[in-house]
UniProtKB/Swiss-Prot annotation:
GO terms for molecular function: GTP cyclohydrolase I activity. This is GTP cyclohydrolase FolE2 1. PANTHER family: GTP CYCLOHYDROLASE MPTA. The record marks 154 as: May be catalytically important. Its EC number is 3.5.4.16. The keyword Translocase does not apply. Belongs to the GTP cyclohydrolase IV family. The gene is folE2-1. InterPro entries: GTP_cyclohydrolase_FolE2 (IPR022838), GTP_cyclohydrolase_FolE2/MptA (IPR003801). Pfam families: GCHY-1.
């Protein structure tokens, strides 16, 4: 039944809790919301993000204010930037009277690419994630994660074969804790430039010839991929801490090859 606006409704979650157990993380997850972002060229791009938002809860408080997480998203105006995401974290902690929290949003991100020979354009989708972590009495950290599909070609197969070499699609996951803003495009390009070849949404026959020969001239083991990308990440001043992983979906096996490498920049 509908309740009159002036009726008293007890706020049960705001009551005291006698168990004296702090909760490190409580909130909402699987919350899908439309999102606008600025791409590397400053143009607006639209997507749908899946949010996970949480705060720490003191031991004496029974529950957090779940509705305020959604209110936080409703209060947004304009495209979300990396700096704006840090502001959202500060607003969330203020709204929920918390000293620690986490915002994670995962979304498909589309980049328009041009085929290497014909020049035809097409969109390619990437999985992207932005994470803001705030611990009590510490500065908030911003992490960017992307999954870039690429082509890898086996150096051993090329060396021992009279013609051809086995190749496959690989997924390279790059995760970077940022010192300053860095575009998704910039992180993706590092992966694509260090792969045997990048992949495209649309290729004509001259383009297919080009990418086939590009991969053949640039063979790399899964170990080569993560090492070459790591060298690029180590020399990126916008990155404080990084991790790179590659999964090669082997075309001659029913399993994947995998490698992971991580480190910190001085």
């Amino acid at each position: 039944m509908n309740a009159p606006e002036n009726i008293f409704l007890p706020d049960v979650q705001a009551a005291a809790d006698t168990r004296r157990l702090a909760i490190q993380s409580v909130g909402v997850k699987g919350l899908r919301y439309p999102l606008q972002l600025e791409n590397a060229a400053g143009e607006l791009t639209s997507t749908v993000a899946t949010f996970a938002m949480s705060v720490g809860l003191p031991p004496e408080v029974k529950g957090t204010h779940m509705s305020r997480f959604v209110e936080l998203l409703e209060a947004r105006t304009g495209p979300l930037t990396q700096v704006g995401l840090l502001r959202m974290m500060a607003d969330m902690l203020l709204r929920l009277d918390a000293s620690s929290g986490r915002i994670e949003l995962a979304f498909p991100y589309f980049i328009r690419k041009m085929a290497p020979v014909s020049g035809v354009e097409s969109l390619l989708d990437y999985d992207a994630t932005l994470i803001v972590d705030q611990r009590a009495w510490e500065s908030a950290t911003l992490t960017l994660r992307v999954v870039a599909p690429v082509t890898s070609l086996c150096p051993c197969s090329k060396k021992i074969s009279d013609y051809g070499a086995h190749n496959q699609r690989s997924h390279i996951t790059l995760e970077a804790r940022l010192r300053s803003p860095m575009s998704i495009e910039d992180l993706v390009r590092i992966a694509e430039e260090e792969a045997s070849c990048e992949v495209f949404g649309l290729l004509k026959r001259p383009d297919e010839k080009w990418v086939t020969e590009r991969a053949y001239d640039n063979p790399k083991f899964v170990e080569d991929l993560v090492r070459d990308i790591a060298l690029r990440l180590m020399n990126e001043p916008r990155i404080a801490e990084w991790k790179v992983a590659s999964e090669n979906f082997e075309s001659i096996h029913n399993h994947s090859a995998y490698a992971e490498l991580y480190g910190c920049n001085e």
